[in-house]
């Protein structure tokens, strides 16, 4: 009896592990499909039906993870804000010129690891924003903190961390998109960002 009981527990554990793996795989497919479609058409321009068709999953599977497409968009966006904050935290305490280089590296690294999500940050609408507001504000606060470090070295072209934050919001990601397929993407992006933000 004991052997049969142990075998049953092992079988149940195996089934649970397989179910967990399947759920994780399905969620990842929804995230990838949503990220691609949202980046191409905007969040408002994509329906749940289009997401599940792209992911090749059922409507029931979608709603098992997300209440609506705004929750899906938030799940795509939150990791990029978290990763960005973690990267910016590593720049604290660096000399101003190294912080400036590290800031550009942060944008380039995020582009490599969270490209579609990064593209969405510029098209967040009023329906999605409440889902990611706290992380968005925290990222901007961390970014401003690093810009203030750079400002302390009298390096900012406009002499203002706050104004440079606005410049980055308008140009940081669009420039990544522009140079994305260029053979010298990293060099051109770095040179462009330095020209926009840092004194010669």
Segments and roles (model prediction):
Residues 25-36, 40, 54, 71-94, ...:
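Alpha-helical structural segments
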Residues 106, 110, 157-181, 185-196:
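Hydrophobic alpha-helical segments that form the core
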Residues 108-130, 177:
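Amphipathic alpha-helical segments used for helix-helix packing
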Residues 50, 64, 74-75, 166:
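DNA-binding alpha-helical recognition surfaces that contact promoter or target DNA
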Residues 56-66:
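Short hydrophobic/aromatic patch on the recognition helix
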Residues 1-41, 45-54, 71:
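Basic, helix-initiating cap at the start of DNA-binding domains
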Residues 102, 128-166, 177:
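Amphipathic alpha-helical packing segments from all-alpha helical-bundle domains
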Residues 40-44, 114, 153:
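Short coil/turn segments at alpha/beta junctions that flank glycine-rich nucleotide-binding fingerprints
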């Amino acid at each position: 009896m004991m052997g049969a009981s142990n075998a049953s527990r092992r079988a149940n554990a195996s089934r649970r592990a397989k179910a967990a793996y399947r759920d994780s795989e399905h969620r990842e497919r929804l995230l990838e499909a949503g990220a691609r479609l949202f980046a191409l058409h905007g969040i408002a321009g994509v329906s749940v039906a289009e997401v599940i068709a792209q992911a090749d999953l059922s409507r029931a599977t979608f709603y098992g993870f997300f209440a609506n497409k705004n929750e899906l968009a938030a799940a795509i966006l939150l990791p990029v804000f978290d990763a960005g904050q973690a990267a910016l935290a590593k720049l604290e305490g660096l000399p101003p010129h190294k912080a400036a280089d590290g800031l550009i590296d942060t944008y380039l690294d995020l582009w490599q690891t969270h490209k579609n999500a990064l593209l969405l940050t510029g098209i967040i609408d009023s329906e999605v924003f409440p889902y990611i507001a706290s992380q968005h504000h925290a990222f901007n606060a961390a970014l401003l903190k690093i810009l203030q470090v750079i400002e302390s070295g009298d390096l900012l072209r406009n002499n203002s961390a706050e104004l440079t934050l606005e410049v980055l919001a308008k140009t940081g990601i669009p420039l990544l998109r522009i140079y994305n397929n260029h053979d010298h993407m990293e060099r051109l992006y770095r040179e462009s960002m330095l020209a926009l933000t840092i004194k010669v």
